[in-house]
Amino acid sequence: WPXAQIFSAVRGXVN
């Protein structure tokens, strides 16, 4: 569960 990756996607909307 890559937090950083998921968090970035959720916050950036899957940049």
Swiss-Prot record:
Subcellular location(s) of the protein: Secreted, Cell wall
Keyword flag Secreted: yes
Cellular component, GO, one term: extracellular region
Record key words, sorted: Cell wall, Secreted
UniProt name for this protein: 34 kDa cell wall protein
